[in-house]
Amino acid sequence: TTPEQARSYVRQIAKDKPDLIKLMITGGVLDAKVKGEPGELKMSPEIVKAACEEAHALGLHVAAHVESPQGVQVALENGVDTIEHGALPSEAIIQLFQDRKACQVATLSPALPFALFDRHVSHVSEMEQYNGKIVFDGIVECAKACLANGIPVGLGTDTGCPYITHYDMWREVNYFHKFCGVSN
């Protein structure tokens, strides 16, 4: 894909009047090829920038599936408005969130079974569990750091992932309290 193709895709999607454009900037736990490296970058910075510029020119916000620090950095440096999931943030990443006035949507529910369930229950491989723990911890630490720095954090469930249904938002709220230490 080229930057111009990315712009073209955004224009095509915009014809259907979506609420936003969502980019899949990284992979995740299930497609990781290396233990300890979930969230492999799937989009170049140039593609992300082109898609974001086009979406913003059309009045659309851009959300991005991101599950690695590199992915968060590429997303924020190139115009993404909201990080879906998240990853272990550095001080530079927190500064990017602030500079861009971006936010995070934490999704603990889909990562939790991979990270914390017994493998006899989750039926995941040892590598998927290991990488799931990295992603889960990254989402939690990203949310904590964002909150500590006045960056808005929303909650989502990532419905459709294993063990996640359309009516599981109550679990997400419970996990947010339990793992991020947030209450009302």
Give the positions of each predicted feature.
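Divalent metal-coordination and catalytic microenvironments
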Residues: 17, 21, 55, 65, ...
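A cross-domain feature marking catalytic cores of carbohydrate-active enzymes
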Residues: 23-25, 64-68, 85-87, 106-108, ...
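Active-site environment of divalent metal-dependent phosphoester hydrolases
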Residues: 27-32, 66-73, 88-91, 112-114, ...
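His/Asp/Glu-enriched, well-ordered alpha-helical/loop segment
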Residues: 57, 61, 124-127, 136-184
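Divalent-metal coordination cores built from histidine and acidic residues
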Residues: 1-60, 93-95, 100-113, 117-120, ...
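Structural recognition of alpha->loop->beta junctions
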Residues: 73-93, 150, 172-184
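Glycine-enriched alpha-helix->loop->beta-strand junction motifs that scaffold or abut catalytic
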Residues: 77-82, 98-104, 122-126, 150-152, ...
